[in-house]
């Protein structure tokens, strides 16, 4: 309480200072000459602290206003927020004396008076909240009102606002460019109509408070708690005339330091932020035109509106008649006012959330207007030109119809609703401005100009209300999580529907699913991104769609040509014993031909690998082993009769060159797959015809152990004997017999054959078994199948065959050297191991690091030896070295690790070798043999980091055990054998010599220096360094006595002695039992 009294006394004495008192009194005298012709001004938002002579002393400070001294010292808050309860009680207790007084939650601007208008009657104080809860009496309003003086608005503004109490702060909001003629909305205008002071000395104020005429129940709404928009026009001083030089000089003479402070406060608090409700209420109850906002934001100070022109635009433009003029006060204006004062009206309709208001709708070309006519027209009727669509107009008039104050005429409503139709139909207006306005309506939705958006704000919350920038709407995001898993989508996230619905939708657009699929398949893979357009389902549906595509005629022609060639070849070789019906020319065969001709494409490039799919392997599982022979180059050509003795039966070579062939078979044949019984009989007949020439067959490789039963030496011996004993006549006879048996087996069956197809189009996609077919002319065993193709074919007949790294070589050429010759050993590369069965597992260490780029097929088609079969074979073959593998597995050493630096590799080399290479005598020339060195040697991890940083060579074991209370060290014994370069289980030769000389010298008293040479001592050091077990080589002891009777002991140990564990800490003494 004492501090409050002291601050009150200081502030009172501060306000009654001579300089400030004299300055304020001069300003008061000058302001007393003000008339009612001044421009549009606003009441201050904060109570004044000026010490006027005409104001009674009790009214210097409001009850709720803090002293300027405390505000300047920042000892309290700058702004006080009143609660709703106090505000409601204050509003309820405020006396009202006006006859037309009603409370309202909206703001109403009255008509500007004429020049000859008399002074307005005294009005009651405003009913709007402010930053303080103070209230003044009517006597204060009247006494302060009589002090006005007719002066220039700009000069009077500079004089009167300097005396206002100021609060230090910064400008937090500013709009527009920093120009001289720009209009700026300034926050917290002290000349605010929401202030409870009677009259302000600033020119920016109303002479009368702004009072609405709305319902009484809306006084406590949130919109009533916010002040109105205050707009400052900086260019008023340039438009005024007859400036009083004497008054200007008097204001410049008496300049106080507090004037700048008061002016800063006045500039920082000349406007306040509104909520959305306040903006709507302003539009409902006011008479201002939208050009008010246009003048504030556009920066054009000379913008005026021709009221005569707007009065003639009722027929062609959207003109809304506003008859809700319920104001009781008048707007002050000077002789030559700014365009804000000339504003005819403000529209009374509700603003939408974000209406697009163009500058062309708000502004018009400047023109000279008769002031009396414009004022009379403003008093009678106010017209507003706004651009609204039909929905907004309906909303506007629906709100007006629901109002209790008045009702809108039906004709006016009909006029506003038909506004768009009239503007579009009536292209010719009364003047040029109407035409421009109608043309601009079409582009209203497409312009990128600024938009006004109004946001909701809480009570006394400083948030931005007007956004004059446009904000584009963000594009809607599509998330994959919102899609269902069972639906199919392509790369562009287009749903692939079922066949029926998809066809219906595509036929409407003039497309079909077949066209899309064929266009997709026809595109070759040219870039990396094209790989993602391929799918495994393309080839599966290719056979179904090719019968209906645009290439049907070409397929029929190709089909007919191959069918006729097959007929001619068949009839020429067999003399017409079989008719054309045996070829099975049916519609199903034609479809099968089309499928096989299109699906199974030759693999000639790397891009062709992506045309393959796993469905091909599933379909080709039905083909048997004999069918693979029949459709490969091993199958003899039917075209070649007894006269043509050259057979196409060949084997695979080790080079990746073209196929060496003599004859080109023009006849192709296939089997009907749906007849399993006939297929079994047919395949058995073919096997007998192919392998029954010599009368003995070799078993087929069906498991892991069958691979090792193949002996390369036997095939070498047969090749030697067969090459020397047979001649060309024998080859011809053997080939002719094979052809006759094959032909008889082909047509003894009752199965219908498929239509002729490409000779190799139906080759197996799954790996076939390795079949050993002995022959006199053939030197090696023949490996058939594997679906991979890693080379380009120049031959047309072999273009679609899928080959292994082996190549076909015609075995009928007896003059060609066999594999034992040195020519082929230099040219031929070593092939990989033959693949076992399909259902066997894959070991990660069986893959080479370069296989990722070399393997053309998916990883699911790579087949490797099963570990279970390998272990079973090792058990049968009595290879028991599992301890070695177990230790390596524990240490994290891979199985293909090469122990080339130890004796272990030399001792176990014969046991670790693959049995494939041990069974053949001619290992270098075997078609299944690799290089002479093993895979472990060529692909070892020697010199590289191993898994889990495993040991790459033998390292000593840890000889210490650290327990909780002691550390135990163990030493090596004599019988502990290790693998190293010198076999440390026994002494080295140098150590043996050293020990012998030592014992001899001790017994004979001979100095060791005369016995050993320096070179020998150096060699002892080298032997010690070569010891991998870190056993220090014992050197000769240094003698102490001349007779060498005593030798100095050395603190070292060797492997020759077994020592007990040594406890290196005295913990054993502590753990021993203590005496009492």
Swiss-Prot record:
Compositional bias annotation for Basic residues: 1-11
Biased composition, class Pro residues, residue ranges: 118-128
Compositional bias segments (type: Polar residues): 23-34, 107-117, 193-206, 214-223, 362-378, 690-701, 739-748
Residue ranges with Acidic residues bias: 419-450
UniProt induction comment: Repressed by zinc.
Keyword set, alphabetical order: Cytoplasm, Phosphoprotein, Zinc
GO biological process, one term: fungal-type cell wall organization
Biased amino acid composition, Basic and acidic residues: 408-418, 576-585
One Gene Ontology term, aspect cellular component: mitochondrion
Region named Disordered: 1-66, 85-162, 190-223, 234-253, 357-450, 534-557, 566-585, 658-701, 713-762, 909-931, 1000-1020, 1042-1076
Cellular compartment(s): Cytoplasm; Bud; Bud neck; Bud tip
Modified residues (Phosphoserine): 275, 354, 403, 407, 632, 676
Biased composition (Low complexity): 93-106
Family: Belongs to the ZRG8 family.
Subunit structure: Interacts with BUD27, GIS1 and SSD1.
Function: Involved in the integrity functions of RAM, a conserved signaling network that regulates maintenance of polarized growth and daughter-cell-specific transcription.
Designated name of the protein: Zinc-regulated protein 8
UniProt organism field: Saccharomyces cerevisiae (strain ATCC 204508 / S288c) (Baker's yeast)
Upper taxonomic lineage: Eukaryota, Fungi, Dikarya, Ascomycota, Saccharomycotina
Gene for this chain: ZRG8
């Amino acid at each position: 309480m004492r501090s409050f009294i002291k601050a009150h006394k200081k502030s009172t004495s501060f306000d009654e200072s001579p300089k400030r008192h004299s300055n304020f009194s001069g300003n008061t005298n000058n302001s007393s000459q003000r008339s009612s012709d001044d421009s549009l001004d606003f009441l201050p938002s904060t109570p004044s602290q000026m010490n006027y002579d005409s104001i009674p002393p009790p009214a210097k400070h409001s009850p709720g206003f803090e002293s300027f001294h405390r505000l300047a010292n920042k000892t309290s808050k700058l702004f006080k927020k009143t609660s709703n309860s106090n505000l409601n009680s204050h509003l309820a207790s405020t006396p009202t004396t006006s006859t037309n007084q009603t409370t309202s939650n909206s703001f109403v601007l009255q008509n500007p008076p004429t020049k000859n208008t008399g002074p307005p009657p005294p009005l009651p104080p405003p009913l709007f909240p402010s930053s303080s809860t103070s209230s003044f009496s009517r006597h204060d309003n009247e006494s302060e009102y009589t002090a006005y003086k007719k002066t220039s608005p700009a000069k009077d503004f500079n004089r009167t606002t300097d005396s206002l109490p100021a609060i230090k702060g910064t400008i937090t909001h500013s709009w527009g460019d920093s120009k001289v003629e720009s209009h700026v909305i300034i926050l917290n205008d002290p000349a605010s109509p929401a202030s409870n002071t009677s009259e302000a000395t600033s020119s920016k104020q109303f002479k009368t408070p702004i009072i609405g005429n709305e319902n009484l129940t809306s006084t406590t709404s949130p919109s009533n708690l916010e002040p109105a928009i205050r707009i400052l026009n900086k260019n008023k001083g340039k438009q005024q005339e007859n400036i009083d030089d004497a008054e200007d000089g008097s204001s410049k003479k008496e300049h106080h330091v507090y004037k700048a402070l008061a002016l800063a406060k006045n500039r920082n608090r000349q406007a306040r932020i509104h909520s959305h409700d306040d903006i709507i209420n302003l539009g409902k109850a006011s008479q201002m035109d939208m050009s008010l906002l246009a003048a504030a934001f556009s920066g054009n100070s000379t913008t005026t509106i021709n009221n005569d022109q707007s009065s003639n635009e009722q027929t062609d433009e959207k003109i809304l008649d506003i008859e809700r003029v319920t104001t009781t006060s008048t707007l002050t204006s000077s002789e030559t006012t700014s365009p804000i004062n000339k504003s005819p009206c403000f529209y009374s309709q509700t603003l939408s959330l974000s209406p697009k208001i163009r500058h062309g709708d708000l502004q018009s070309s400047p023109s000279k207007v008769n002031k009396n006519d414009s004022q009379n027209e403003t008093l009678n009727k106010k017209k507003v030109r706004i651009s609204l669509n039909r929905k907004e107009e309906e909303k506007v008039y629906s709100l007006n119809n629901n109002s209790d104050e008045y009702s809108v005429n039906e004709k006016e409503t009909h006029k506003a609703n038909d506004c768009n139709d009239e503007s579009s139909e009536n292209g010719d207006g009364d003047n040029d401005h109407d035409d421009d306005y109608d043309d601009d309506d079409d582009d209203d939705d497409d312009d990128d100009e600024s938009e006004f958006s109004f946001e909701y704000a809480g009570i006394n919350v400083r948030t931005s209300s007007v956004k004059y920038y446009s904000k584009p709407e963000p594009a809607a995001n599509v998330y994959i999580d919102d899609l269902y898993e069972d639906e199919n989508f392509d790369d562009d996230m287009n749903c692939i529907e079922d066949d029926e619905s998809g066809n219906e939708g595509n036929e409407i657009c003039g497309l079909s699913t077949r066209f899309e699929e064929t266009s997709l398949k026809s595109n070759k893979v040219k870039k990396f991104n094209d790989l993602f357009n391929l799918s495994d389902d393309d080839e599966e549906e290719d056979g179904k769609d090719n019968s209906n595509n645009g290439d049907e005629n070409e397929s029929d022609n190709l089909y007919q040509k191959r069918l006729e060639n097959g007929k001619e070849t068949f009839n020429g070789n067999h003399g017409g014993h079989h008719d054309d019906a045996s070829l099975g020319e049916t519609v199903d065969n034609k479809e099968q031909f089309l499928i096989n001709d299109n699906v199974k494409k030759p693999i000639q490039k790397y891009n062709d690998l992506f045309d393959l799919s796993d469905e091909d392997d599933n379909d080709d599982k039905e083909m048997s082993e004999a069918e693979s022979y029949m459709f490969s180059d091993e199958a003899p050509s039917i075209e070649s009769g007894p006269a043509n003795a050259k057979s196409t039966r060949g084997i695979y070579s080790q080079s990746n060159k073209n196929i060496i062939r003599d004859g080109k078979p023009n006849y192709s044949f296939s089997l009907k797959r749906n007849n399993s019984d006939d297929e079994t009989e047919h395949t058995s007949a073919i096997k007998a015809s192919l392998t029954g020439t010599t009368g003995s067959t070799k078993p087929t490789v069906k498991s892991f152990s069958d691979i090792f039963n193949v002996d390369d030496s036997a095939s070498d011996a047969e090749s030697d004997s067969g090459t020397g004993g047979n001649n060309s006549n024998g080859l011809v006879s053997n080939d002719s017999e094979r052809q006759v048996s094959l032909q008889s087996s082909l047509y003894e069956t009752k199965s219908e054959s498929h239509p002729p197809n490409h000779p190799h189009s139906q080759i197996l996609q799954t790996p076939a078994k390795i079949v050993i077919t002995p022959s006199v002319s053939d030197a090696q065993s023949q490996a058939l199948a594997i679906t991979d193709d890693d080379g380009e074919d120049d031959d047309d007949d072999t273009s679609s065959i899928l080959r292994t790294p082996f190549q076909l070589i015609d075995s009928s050429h007896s003059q060609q050297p066999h594999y034992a010759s040195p020519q082929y050993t230099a040219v031929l590369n070593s092939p990989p191991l033959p693949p076992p069965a399909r259902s066997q597992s894959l070991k990660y260490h069986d893959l080479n690091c370069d296989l990722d780029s070399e393997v053309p097929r998916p990883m699911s088609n790579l087949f490797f030896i099963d570990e279970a079969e390998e272990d079973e074979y090792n058990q049968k073959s009595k290879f028991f070295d599992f301890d070695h593998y177990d230790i390596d597995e524990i240490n994290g050493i891979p199985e293909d690790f090469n122990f080339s630096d130890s004796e272990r590799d030399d001792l176990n080399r014969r046991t670790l070798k693959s049995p494939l290479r041990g069974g053949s005598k001619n290992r270098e020339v075997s078609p299944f043999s690799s290089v002479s060195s093993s895979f472990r040697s060529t692909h070892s991890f020697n010199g590289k980091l191993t898994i889990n940083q495993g040991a790459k060579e033998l390292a000593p074991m840890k000889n210490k055990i650290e327990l909780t209370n002691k550390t135990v060290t163990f030493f090596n014994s004599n019988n502990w054998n290790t693998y190293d370069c010198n076999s440390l289980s026994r002494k080295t030769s140098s150590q043996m010599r050293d020990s012998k000389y030592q014992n001899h010298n001790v017994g004979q008293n001979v100095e060791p220096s005369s016995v050993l040479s320096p070179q020998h001592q150096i060699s002892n050091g080298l032997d010690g360094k070569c010891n991998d077990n870190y056993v220090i080589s014992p050197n000769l002891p240094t003698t102490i006595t001349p007779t060498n009777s005593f030798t100095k002991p050395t603190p070292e140990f060797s492997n020759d002695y077994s020592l007990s564990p040594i406890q290196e800490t005295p913990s054993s003494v502590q753990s021993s039992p203590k005496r009492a």
